[in-house]
Regions:
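AAA+/SF3 P-loop NTPase mechanochemical coupling elements
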Residues: 92-101, 130-147, 158-167
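Conserved AAA+ ATPase core "coupling" helix
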Residues: 75, 79, 155-209, 217-227
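Dynamic helix-loop-helix/coil hinge segments at AAA+ ATPase domain boundaries and subdomain interfaces
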Residues: 1-25, 214-215
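Conserved AAA+/SF3 P-loop NTPase catalytic/coupling segment centered on the Walker-B
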Residues: 97-124, 138, 153-162, 174-182
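C-terminal engagement/docking regions of AAA+ P-loop ATPases
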Residues: 1, 235-321
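Walker A/P-loop
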Residues: 33-70
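P-loop (Walker A) phosphate-binding loop of NTP-binding proteins
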Residues: 44, 78, 146
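Conserved alpha-helical scaffold flanking the Walker A/P-loop in AAA+ ATPase domains
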Residues: 28-31, 84-104
Length: 321
């Protein structure tokens, strides 16, 4: 376990050369990498979301591509297309930017549904079809999609079924005053600071195997299942004491959320140098895993209740094993 903790600490140290005050964002993205899942990031422009994922790709020695999603984007612009070569009289494949290890899907909610579907299909299946041929995407394959919480005009909201495919949703906030002072003094020179490759793709895959092997007691699994049960409105009819929570939820989390929570909890334990999962690991990842999987009711909007507040209430309500 110590070697994995050392590798992750090296990754954090390299990221800190460029990124100030975004320790939580870095740790959460690294968690998603090891858990082999994709991430949706919400935050206003200028909070170093692009710099964070680009830096992590460099540290891991992975190929990085950025796709700027716009209303006029076509699925072929993402996945690739067939090009007719007149001198040969044949079609050749031109692969799209999705053929990379790390993809930044910038402002994914700016593109129409058919483009979102093409991107999300690639995320889920790890392959794309161009013409009549199906092509495997490179491994490891990681997508970080961003969306802006403001300026919602001209956007296409991601359907709940598609949101569920993201392992985590991260919310990036403004840096603290002392960190912002350091950022301003750097005058935007952070992207030019060199970083070293400290974790190879082979080591990343090895770390994923180690995370899968983390011990998880049945009591922890029961704890996760109980958390999911309270997110479902039907639970209010069986457990009246949870009604104060479920009345704010229109649709709850699916079993996929439980799988994601267990995966992330195992990685959290690995990063802490443990070979077993504690309830604290589940609590540490609960907000990131659940916040985009809860569809809130009109009552929640009326009372100005957020998904994070509901998740906090659920964690307080469920007994810790």
């Amino acid at each position: 376990m110590e070697k994995y903790v050392e590798l992750i600490n090296k990754c954090r140290a390299e990221c800190a050369k460029r990124l100030v005050g975004q320790d939580a964002l870095i740790n959460d993205i690294l968690t998603a990498f090891v858990a082999d899942g994709h991430v949706l990031v919400e935050g206003v422009p200028g909070l170093a979301k692009t710099l964070a994922i680009k830096t992590i790709a460099e540290i891991l020695g992975l190929d990085f591509k950025r796709i700027q999603f716009t209303p006029d984007l076509l699925p072929a612009d993402v996945t690739g297309t067939l090009i007719y070569e007149q001198n040969k009289g044949t079609f050749s494949v031109r692969k799209g930017p999705v053929f990379a290890n790390v993809i930044l899907a910038d402002e994914i909610n700016r593109a129409p549904a058919k483009v979102q579907s093409a991107m999300l299909e690639a995320m889920e299946e790890r392959q794309v079809t161009i013409g009549e041929e199906t092509y495997k995407l490179p491994s490891p394959f990681f997508v970080l999609a961003t969306q802006n919480p403001v300026e919602q005009e001209g956007t296409y909201n991601l359907p709940e079924a598609e949101l569920d495919r993201f392992l985590m949703k991260l919310v990036v906030n403004y840096p603290a005053a002392e960190n912002e002072k350091l950022i301003v003094k750097s005058c935007g020179k952070a992207p030019a600071i060199p970083v070293q490759t400290v974790l190879t793709p082979v080591q990343l895959l090895d770390m994923r195997k180690a995370a899968d092997g983390i011990t998880c007691d049945d009591k922890i699994v029961d704890y996760i299942v109980n958390i999911l049960a309270v997110t479902r409105p039907v639970a209010a009819t069986k457990e009246k004491s949870s009604h104060d929570i479920t009345r704010y939820i229109h649709f709850g989390a699916s079993p996929r959320a439980g799988i994601a929570m267990l995966q992330c909890a195992k990685v959290n334990a690995l990063f802490a140098g443990r070979d077993f999962v504690l309830p604290e690991d589940v609590k540490a990842v609960a907000n990131n895993v659940l916040r985009h999987r809860l569809v809130l009711s009109y009552e929640a909007a009326a009372d100005n209740i957020t998904a994070d507040e509901i998740i906090s209430r659920i964690l307080d309500f469920i007994p810790v094993p």
